[in-house]
Each structure stands twice: as C-alpha cells, then as structure tokens.
Amino acid sequence: MVKRQVRRIGAIAAIGLVTALYLITRPLPPIPDGRDVFGFASDTGTRPPTGSVPAIDRYPARDGEQLAFQFYDSTGEVILVFVHGSSYHGAAYHTLARELSDAGIAKVYLPNVRGHYLSGRRRGDVDYIGQLEDDLADLVAYIRGRGQRGPLILGGHSSGGGLAIRVAGGEHGDLASAYLLLSPVIPLAPTTRSGDAGGWAHLHRSRLFGLLVLNAVGVTGLNGLPIIQFNKPEAFRDGTETLDYSYRLNTSFHPRYDYAADIEAMGDRFLLLIGDDA
C-alpha cells in the first residue's frame, strides 16, 4: 500500500515536472504590434543631449563587478538614490536629477541597474534573485565611503519604485531613511495583475508558470531564461535599452509575492506620487 502511494506521488511529480519543462521550452511569443504605447515620438526629454549628462562613474559590487551610475552634486546634504524603470537606464531621469541638485534639495545618484546599459556582464540578466538589493547596498556603502553622511532617500520610478519597495522589506531594509515612489510597479497588485502596461510589457505566462513550479521544488538552473519583453518600437531605440528580462532579473526588480509585507516595512517613511493621462 505504501509503495503504491509512493509510486503514485512519484508519477504525479514526474508529470508536473515534465509539464513545467514543456511550458518553459515554448518559445517567446512575438510582440503583437509595434505601437508607441508610451509616446516616445513626442517625448523630447527622454534622452538628454550629449554633453549635458554627467559622465558615467563606477562603483564596486561585492562580486567584483563595476556597476555604472551618474552623480549630480549639490549643496544639499540629503542623498537621493533614484532607480530607473524597465528597459532603459538612469540617463532618462537626467532632468529630475538636475533640477533637484541645482535647487540644493539633494545630491542625486542615478544607478544603471545590473543587467542594463553598462552594468553587468549580461544584458537582461542577473546572477541570482535578490542581487539588485545587494548591489544597492554596495552603492550605499560606496556613497558613505565618499564621506557623504546625509540622510539617504531611496527612490524609483515604475519598476525602480518596485525595487525600492522590495529593498524596504528585505535584509537591507535599513539602507534608507525614506522612500520616494513614482508610480511603482507591483505585479501582483489588483491594478497591474492582469495588465500589460498598455501594451508595453509582454509576459511569457506559460514559461513563468513553469519556472515557478521548478523553483518551488528547488530547481533554479533555468532562471536565466527570458520571461518578459518590452515593446519599444525600433524607430525609438538607441542601442542602450534592454528589451527583455530573465526570470531572476524580473523577480529581483519587483516587490516579493507578499508585497504587503514589503510595503508595511516602509512604515510612514515614503512619498508616493501617481499621475494620470489628463
């Protein structure tokens, strides 16, 4: 009787693993259209003119990788580390950083998240889930090593805001004094759970499901496979964007599945700004 139950459980597990592998190996579906969903054609401020942006600097991560950032000095003592959204990099927030620094509000750091332009060995991937949090902790250690001791705000837009929330709920939750969240992405929240950001983000749902099954039983060797693609029309690409994310990068870039706990960890130390189309 016991042997029969063991065989039955083994058969069910084998079927589950085979199904997961089948879902994972299915190719990424093509993006259905090349619509300019974010209005790149009318946005003259996304990429500032060459020469107006601070030079790329580097800081050492714990694995020895030199990760890219831009620094905007200021007379203010407050430090803002502001994380970019999906696909692009810190330079997209040049105007925000320049205005804050010139006004004496904050010294601003714009990191290029690992797996993006000039940061990391592989575009669209990291080495393990949680590496982006470790990278931000290493950036803060670098900042403090430069003698900058002011209050530190961790901020971000879109996925970058999601990463800030994730940091708050993790082992590096003491990094920041406060948080600045601009339309943060929380994938499992009711407002985004079933959406694709207006056609911007295309998720390979079957592959994601298969990887979730494998990760649940401790199989992580396929986490480097891409699961999401971004719909940036070719006419508006400049070669510095990242057009797909692996499972482990995408997971690292957003709050945990229990996102309420990550949000709760911020307490009342955050400012949330959300706009609309008006």
Predicted regions span which residues?
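Active-site nucleophile loop of the alpha/beta-hydrolase fold
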Residues: 180-190
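Alpha/beta-hydrolase active-site loop
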Residues: 126-145
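Short beta-strand element of the alpha/beta-hydrolase
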Residues: 77-85
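Conserved alpha/beta-hydrolase
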Residues: 100-121
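An N-terminal hydrophobic leader/cap segment in hydrolases
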Residues: 2-60, 68-70
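Short glycine-enriched nucleophile-adjacent loop
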Residues: 161-173, 179
